[in-house]
């Protein structure tokens, strides 16, 4: 059995590893490499895939979405070699790193893609639940933000119902953070001014 000090150091190391990986601002890197300038200067000022899409480059937005998700997946899977607790710590670190990246003044994305990536790495079946909830909500309401909020709300409930309390607790915390990061979107949804999927601007 590992000593408590070693165990704690391992968890801290996993958290830091995940944070550093999650801090990579792929949206900013890709738009600059494509000659589109600083994505933070357009739209919402966000570095995530939704704002990258506002450049008009769908392929770049898709690449941003995939890479932002893979940050979470990679962090969780690599750390999983040291046990589930390390994987959870690394996944959470990647999520926080995406939200508050050290490289660009701690101003990152809203975390949905990395949330999904961590979910894929820790509980792939939960990722299917997320995808189903997102798609159904998007088809019915046509709001990307609402779809993400509903999907993230369903995940911890689904995980808890399957008896995985540790992961349910992790994603419940992450869901609360996702809601906080989307508070402007929630306000616009309530006011009827949120942009729908496919809308310009």
From Swiss-Prot:
The chain crosses the membrane at residues 10-30, 60-80, 86-106, 116-136, 166-186. It is found in: Cell inner membrane. It comes from the Bacteria. It is an enzyme of class 2 (transferase). Probably interacts with PlsX. Belongs to the PlsY family. Catalyzes the transfer of an acyl group from acyl-phosphate (acyl-PO(4)) to glycerol-3-phosphate (G3P) to form lysophosphatidic acid (LPA). This enzyme utilizes acyl-phosphate as fatty acyl donor, but not acyl-CoA or acyl-ACP. This is Glycerol-3-phosphate acyltransferase. The lineage of its organism: Bacteria, Pseudomonadati, Pseudomonadota, Alphaproteobacteria, Hyphomicrobiales. The gene is plsY.
